[in-house]
Regions:
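Active-site-proximal acidic secondary-structure segment that organizes catalysis
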Residues: 5, 10-12, 16, 22, ...
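A generic structural signal for alpha-helix starts
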Residues: 44-48, 96, 143-147
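Gly/Ser/Thr-rich phosphate-binding loops and adjoining beta-strand/alpha-helix segments
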Residues: 3-13, 17, 30-49, 99-103, ...
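Short catalytic/binding micro-motifs of nucleotide second-messenger systems
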Residues: 65, 109-115
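Short small-residue beta-strand/loop micro-motif enriched in glycine and branched aliphatics
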Residues: 32-34, 86-90, 145
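Short Pro/Gly-enriched beta-strand edge/turn motifs at strand-loop
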Residues: 103-109
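Short amphipathic alpha-helices and their capping loops
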Residues: 1-28, 51-98, 119, 154, ...
């Protein structure tokens, strides 16, 4: 049984994560778990400030730093990396058609994530053919859902605006993924809350 990975405590997968892993094994296209989207605005962007805001958002979000690992028996675990040091790419679609830009981002979305000790999301800063600026985001559904995706992108925007414009407040702290994970695992292990739910339904 794995207890630590790269110096980090490890945790079991939740029921939902196990379910995603189960059906992915039977899908011919492993990118079935990928969620891709883009967020752009018709204004000039300070790319270095945006890049710094993305790194800061990663620092503030445990859920976006999830890594997975398997032990010798094939059991899967998760842990939280200390920080993200990956290069945040910039892609300029100026001179391309809208269709070409969309096709490129769809190709990005079709690439499944590596499972072992690998980041489970990707951010690319983009300029679209019509001059809009922003980010493309790709996440694995084992770690990202619609709500967490929106919260993460919102945090990037608020961090950027705080750094760039006077009078914009610093965003509130992000909720702890680990705290919620521990609650979920306790619930799944047969907590009183689970018993009440079973009796109710």
């Amino acid at each position: 049984m794995m207890k630590t990975r790269k110096g980090h405590p490890v945790y079991p997968l939740t029921v939902a994560q196990k379910f995603h892993l189960f059906y992915q094994a039977f899908c011919p296209k492993k990118e079935v778990l990928n969620i891709g989207t883009s967020l752009t605005i018709d204004t000039e962007i300070d790319w270095e400030v945006l890049r710094a805001s993305i790194y800061k958002a990663y620092e503030r979000s445990e859920g976006m730093r999830i890594r997975f690992a398997k032990d010798k028996e094939g059991n899967c675990y998760q842990y939280i990396a200390d920080k993200e040091e990956r290069e945040i790419e910039f892609v300029d679609f100026t001179g391309k058609t809208e269709e070409e830009a969309a096709d490129t981002m769809q190709e990005w979305t079709r690439v499944p994530f590596k499972f072992q000790d690998s980041p489970m999301n990707r951010i690319v800063m983009i300029r679209t053919p019509d001059g809009y600026n922003g980010v493309y985001f790709l996440g694995d559904h084992m770690t990202v859902d619609a709500q967490s995706l929106i919260c993460f992108l919102k945090d990037i925007i608020e961090l950027y605006c705080n750094a760039k414009y006077e009078g914009v407040p610093y965003p509130k702290d992000m909720a702890s993924y680990l705290e919620q994970l521990k609650k979920d695992l306790a619930y799944e292990a047969g907590s009183r809350a689970q018993q009440r739910d079973r009796e109710y339904f």
